[in-house]
Regions:
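Inter-lobe coupling linker of SF2 helicases/translocases
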Residues: 1, 5-6, 31-170
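Helicase-associated low-complexity regulatory tails and linkers flanking the ATPase motor
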Residues: 1, 70, 74, 96, ...
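SF2 helicase/translocase ATPase core recognition
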Residues: 1-36, 84-111, 224, 228-278
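Short beta-strand/turn micro-motifs composed of small residues
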Residues: 7, 139, 176, 202, ...
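Short, cationic motifs built from Arg/Lys/His that form the positively charged side of catalytic pockets
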Residues: 79, 136, 157, 210, ...
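Short, contiguous acidic/charged loop-to-helix segments that flank catalytic cores in large enzymes
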Residues: 149-151, 202-205, 250-252
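Helix N-cap/beta->alpha junction signal
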Residues: 154, 177-180
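Conserved helicase ATPase core of P-loop NTP-dependent helicases/translocases
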Residues: 173-175, 183-186, 192-233
């Protein structure tokens, strides 16, 4: 039997992810009889707290990666998209906004608190990450009060989106990381451009309706906008009907970003795709 692996993107999270793929091809390829031995060769592990009296092991840093690369070259090949497709280069732009008033005061208060928590070695990694997410939410126009209720702080990103769309011709993809923002964007677009102007792909949309949304975005002239969460709609879809992609908000996942960019920048795209980060 012949075994092969085909992947659309390189390993983006950790070199350690290679072990199971190579073991599937042939357990002898990398020269290790166990994952533990492989991990010890290519990663220095450390422990972080994740709760009361609970710790998990994570890589502190990777090592001997040139050796691993040489081993991979013996049985793998890589062809980049620009080597097999005639696509125009991606164009990138950024639109900056400044926090003002109440939002700025809340951000500064959260920032000071977050710095204290991040520097405290006794506090778990998940709690530290929560503080960073709170800052990110304020930048995206909302926060949660002490009762867990969502509070709107500003419209600056929506205003920036309005300006961009006023300058843009053709269809547009708008990616947003938070459900709050997705609903806000959809409401704005349907109010200004009409109920049929916008389709969406995110967690609340069922699989059948997601497929319909893609088909309408690609083929229906009445549909101008696709609003989605890149973690939900950013993989495997063809959305080449547009040449403008707006990132209203981002996550911290690089793989999600790359994959969502390539929904428009793929086979069938004739124009130059512009990516705008707010």
């Amino acid at each position: 039997a012949i075994r092969r692996i085909l992947t659309g993107s390189p390993i983006t999270k950790s070199p350690l992810d290679l072990y199971t793929q190579c073991a599937f091809l042939n357990p002898q390829l990398l020269g290790f009889t166990s994952y533990l031995a492989f991990r010890n060769r290519y990663a220095e592990m450390g422990e972080i707290p994740v709760g009361s009296n609970r710790w998990i092991s994570i890589p502190k840093y990777y090592k001997n990666l040139e050796e691993l690369e040489q081993k991979l070259k013996q049985f793998s090949s890589r062809i980049r998209k620009d080597q097999c497709l005639d696509l125009k280069p991606k164009i990138r732009q950024k639109r900056y906004i400044q926090l003002e008033g109440k939002a700025k005061k809340i951000y500064e208060k959260l920032r000071i608190n977050a710095l204290a928590i991040v520097e405290d070695s006794t506090i778990s990694f998940s709690n530290k990450l929560t503080e960073i997410v709170k800052l990110h939410q304020v930048c995206n126009g909302f926060t949660k009060d002490d009762d867990g209720q969502m509070l709107k702080l500003h419209d600056q990103k929506i205003e920036a989106l309005k300006e961009i769309l006023d300058e843009t011709d053709g269809k547009v993809i708008i990616w947003a990381n938070y459900l709050w923002n997705i609903h806000e964007i959809i409401f704005f677009l349907k109010t200004k451009y009409g109920e049929q102007s916008t389709v969406s792909i995110f967690g609340e949309v069922n699989v059948k309706d997601r497929k319909t949304a893609v088909e309408r975005f690609q083929n229906d002239k009445e549909v101008k906008f696709l609003v989605g969460n890149p973690s939900t709609g950013g993989f495997g879809l063809t959305l080449t009907a547009c040449t403008t992609v707006i990132y209203y908000s981002n996550s911290y996942n690089y793989e999600v970003r790359l994959q969502s960019e390539d929904r428009a920048h793929r086979m069938g795209q004739k124009g130059s795709v512009v990516y705008i980060d707010i």
